[in-house]
Amino acid sequence: MSEDHHDEEQFDSAESGAAATFPKQCSALRKNEHVMIRGRPCKIVEMSTSKTGKHGHAKVHMVAIDIFTTKKLEDICPSTHNMDVPVVKRREYILMSIEDGFCSLMDPESCELKDDLKMPEGDLGNTIREALEKDEGSVLVQVVAACGEEAILGYKISTKE
């Protein structure tokens, strides 16, 4: 009996249970909206619809870019079918420091610290690093979260006053 109680505690401590995706009819999707393709959260960059043929529904052809890897993905779906749409959240954090490739971030509203995000690779990471070193103002990074993943996808400088 005590084992059952232990299982309940583990269940209670789980995440909030908010869904990572919601369904939306394929024909209702639009360019620049988000959609799940092959299990990845993507932003639609092109859409085209084929006419209804003698063997079924009109088809929607989508070209989308993975919001985290920037890889191009394509999908074709009957217009009446539902597709999963990821819940994408964007937040700004103040970049405090960079240590061992990880960013130390502060939420400007709650002042809570966050230090579990990797510095982006390539040009974006280099320009953010340079902006922090120049110390021309606070570096605000844009963090995008979807489907259990988080990444820094942009930044801006908030000048000192």
Swiss-Prot record:
The modification Hypusine is found at residue 54. One of its GO terms (biological process) is gamete generation. Pfam families: eIF-5a, IF5A-like_N. The keyword Metal-binding does not apply. Disulfide bonds: none annotated. GO terms for molecular function: ribosome binding; RNA binding; translation elongation factor activity. InterPro entries: IF5A-like (IPR001884), IF5A-like_N (IPR048670), NA-bd_OB-fold (IPR012340), Rib_uL2_dom2 (IPR014722), Trans_elong_IF5A_hypusine_site (IPR019769), Transl_elong_IF5A_C (IPR020189), Translation_prot_SH3-like_sf (IPR008991). The keyword RNA-binding applies. It is found in: Cytoplasm. Expressed specifically in the germline in the distal region of gonads where germ cells actively proliferate. GO terms for cellular component: cytoplasm. It comes from the Eukaryota. This is Eukaryotic translation initiation factor 5A-1. Keywords: Cytoplasm, Elongation factor, Hypusine, Protein biosynthesis, RNA-binding. Lys-54 undergoes hypusination, a unique post-translational modification that consists in the addition of a butylamino group from spermidine to lysine side chain, leading to the formation of the unusual amino acid hypusine. eIF-5As are the only known proteins to undergo this modification, which is essential for their function. Translation factor that promotes translation elongation and termination, particularly upon ribosome stalling at specific amino acid sequence contexts. Binds between the exit (E) and peptidyl (P) site of the ribosome and promotes rescue of stalled ribosome: specifically required for efficient translation of polyproline-containing peptides as well as other motifs that stall the ribosome. Acts as a ribosome quality control (RQC) cofactor by joining the RQC complex to facilitate peptidyl transfer during CAT tailing step.
